[in-house]
Amino acid sequence: MASSSSGGAGGAGGASGAPEVKIHNVYMSNVEEEFARIRGFVEDYPYVAMDTEFPGVVATPLGTFRSKEDFNYQQVFCNVNMLKLIQVGFAMVNDKGELPPTGDVWQFNFNFSFAEDMFSHESVEMLRQAGIDFTLLQNNGIPTAVFGELLTTSGLITDPRITWLTFSSGYDFGYLLKSITLGDLPKEESTFFMCHKTLFPTSFDIKILLRTPNCASAKLKGGLQEVADQLDVKRQGVRHQAGSDALLTAATFFKIKKQFFGDNWNQIAPLICGHMFGLGSSLSLFHSSGSTSRLGDETPQGLIGVPQQA
């Protein structure tokens, strides 16, 4: 089943004269066709903003943890291994944040069954209210193995020229990694980061950008929608649907990059590339009372409780 929804005129940044946005709903019946289209855009649109929707957080790890980041990874580990993807959104843009002339954004819909798969009732109800059709997911959703195989051959992974853009990305990359390997996430966080570096060698997490001294004075806080609102970045599409959230991620990233970094980007980028908010050493990056919020002031709610996707 091929379907698409159109937003208002505008590219990732909502610029006047940009193409009309077309969010393609991708199911099993058209997944190969849409990945073929994606392969045609890789060279000229190498920035891939990505968002996932999944059935919440159902498990909390118990035990003694070395740090908040250690706890956070164990929570990602438990939940990603237990749960299934519901949607993945890709918005591909060029180095100016512009969509292809066709305005394509992709929203992949995965096979999901209330009878067989685990979920958080609260999270699933939120997604249902956002318009996700769970009957279609059960009947025509994409099996994870099919998506992982097509993603592997898409030209989007293992290439450092492809830049992945995310917002609080631990769960996002966790689910993508699981779809590619078809196995559980590594128990050790260091192994997870090695796999991430191999598959997604260039990636930036907006939540990490917000911790840099460049952004400190703006005091941008909250989830993706709240940060976008503070920057006057307009959403196209429906909140809590992965295609719209991916597009908003792209627009927000390029607004931050232009407004706060300018000629300084090439100095900052190597320091934050590959970091995921709440994991690794991310909570100690740029850690000072003068430059950004202190560790105790900004609990990574995107990893403890309901993920901060939008």
From Swiss-Prot:
Consequence of gene disruption: RNAi-mediated knockdown either results in sterility or a reduced brood size. RNAi-mediated knockdown disrupts the arrangement, differentiation and maturation of oocytes in the proximal region and as a result small oocyte-like cells arrange in several rows in the germline. RNAi-mediated knockdown reduces miRNA-mediated deadenylation. RNAi-mediated knockdown reduces ccr-4 and ntl-1 protein levels. In another study, RNAi-mediated knockdown does not alter the levels of let-711 or ccr-4. RNAi-mediated knockdown results in reduced global poly(A) tail deadenylation.
Alphabetical list of InterPro entries matching this protein: CNOT7/CNOT8/Pop2, RNase_CAF1, RNaseH-like_sf, RNaseH_sf
Domain of life of the source: Eukaryota
Cell compartments where the protein resides: Nucleus; Cytoplasm
Catalysed conversion reaction: Exonucleolytic cleavage of poly(A) to 5'-AMP
Main location: nucleus
GO terms, molecular function: metal ion binding; poly(A)-specific ribonuclease activity; RNA binding
A Pfam family annotated for this UniProt entry: CAF1
Binding site for a divalent metal cation 1: 51, 172
GO biological process, one term: regulation of translation
Keywords annotated in UniProt: Cytoplasm, Exonuclease, Hydrolase, Metal-binding, Nuclease, Nucleus, Repeat, RNA-binding, RNA-mediated gene silencing, Transcription, Transcription regulation, Translation regulation
GO cellular component: CCR4-NOT complex; CCR4-NOT core complex; cytoplasm; nucleus; P granule; P-body
Tissue: Highly expressed in the germline. In particular, highly expressed in germ cells that enter meiosis and progress through the pachytene stage.
Binding site for a divalent metal cation 2: 51, 53, 245
EC number(s) on file: 3.1.13.4
Role played: Catalytic component of the CCR4-NOT complex which is one of the major cellular mRNA deadenylases and is linked to various cellular processes including bulk mRNA degradation, miRNA-mediated repression, translational repression during translational initiation and general transcription regulation. Within the complex, plays a role in miRNA-mediated deadenylation in embryos. Within the complex promotes germ cell development and fertility in hermaphrodites. Additional complex functions may be a consequence of its influence on mRNA expression.
Alphabetical list of PANTHER family matching this protein: CCR4-NOT TRANSCRIPTION COMPLEX SUBUNIT
Oligomer status and interactors: Component of the CCR4-NOT complex at least composed of ccf-1, ccr-4 and let-711, which is required for germ cell development in hermaphrodites. Within the complex interacts with let-711.
Family (UniProt): Belongs to the CAF1 family.
The protein's name in its UniProt record: CCR4-NOT transcription complex subunit 7
Species in which this protein is naturally found: Caenorhabditis elegans
